[in-house]
């Protein structure tokens, strides 16, 4: 029912507009002037309403705009209504004599159109024309008005002319359209700015490789220097990206993922990639070359670092390339080699480094900077716990250590003051550690020598004690056999013989035969008169040889015996 009324109203509007255009020019001009006055009032009210809407920052949609036009049509109905039906309402709402004249003129036309529906549809047509003008490429209203009206308000004649719209309605629609267009343009610009900011932030966010899952600590900036001193800065993510994209080897990514995961689980995550010759050191290629040669210990013992350098395509002009490669390998790859390949153990590596040092090679600070544990591979290389004492001679110690042990040719020299201070402290620790190791080695040698001397002294003392005990036991046996009636001279001569058997006298007489001076009776025929009380049978063991003989006593009346020859020794 409502759709049929709207269609009928559209037809009446078109017929009314056509008849008004075909009528006399005077009536058309008078109606146009009065309609323009009404539209001026509507425009002022609309401007006030738009100011209120602008304060509230409400987004106006197409439906809201249609409702605004409907509200304007209702206000216009209050002006164009009959004085008999809405006389009280007209007196309260009309603000100028021109509004009352509008009612008289529209009543004098002799027609009785439906003013509410007519004004509503007229405003809708004006708004449709404004929409058509916005959509038109050349800004004209002639080509796209029928299509816009068909889209928004239903079927309209194809021959409809937009110039038939009153001037006031058209300006009102255009004013509202301009305001909405400005709001839409501002919102579109704001959205574009937001999209641009989001895109910039997305571009600045680094795209980490698969190894970034092992390092969630954020972006760590690593500033490095080349071997010639020229500075070159790469971020942590750029270094990882270069390391993963050196070549297209399929095993590279798998190896690097395993390496970083192992170091992370071990508690020593890789937070900096070493740089050599202005490029990232290829840890994968370095590991592969060293393992092919038999491991790090074999490379150190065979001194084939030059082949490793050629395999990495490093320039031969790099000084101390072997020292740098060995240091970096021990820091980043050797624990992984012990865990996966098991080509050597840390004790063998330490022995190889010490043997290389004895041959005159420069000492490696990293060989003593770590303590090794044979129980588990996870704690294979742990930082040392050396106390570092700060004193006034720190700079002098640093210079002496640098002059004696040399500076390691690092390709990743620090640039900031803090990093330089840390590097100096590390160098001082390295030199102090080397001196400490040398002092400990010398002390160990001295201790070993002292232990050897002490062991020899203990052995000699033990032998002397055994000899003394044996002599004492022999003396006790002799004393027990001849304790009764033994003359004092015999005891004295026996004490003298025992005194000769002391360790000092044994050493003196070890190379000569034993001769014992005794007294002699003078004549040989008188020997038969000697009784058993005048002689003693004696048995002496010297240096493992047993000597047996007879000792004769002498009296003051007889001359002393020149010498006594003992029996042949028995072993």
UniProtKB/Swiss-Prot annotation:
Residues 473-558 form the REKLES domain. Residues 45-117, 190-229, 459-528 are annotated as: Disordered. Its main location: nucleus. It comes from the Eukaryota. Residues 195-206 have a biased composition (Polar residues). InterPro entries: ARI3A/B/C (IPR045147), ARID_dom (IPR001606), ARID_dom_sf (IPR036431), REKLES_domain (IPR023334). One of its GO terms (molecular function) is DNA binding. SUPFAM superfamilies: ARID-like. PANTHER family: AT-RICH INTERACTIVE DOMAIN-CONTAINING PROTEIN ARID DOMAIN- CONTAINING PROTEIN DEAD RINGER PROTEIN B-CELL REGULATOR OF IGH TRANSCRIPTION BRIGHT (PTHR15348), PROTEIN DEAD RINGER (PTHR15348:SF0). Transcription factor. This is Protein dead ringer homolog. It comes from Ciona intestinalis (Transparent sea squirt). The gene is Ci-DRIL1/2.
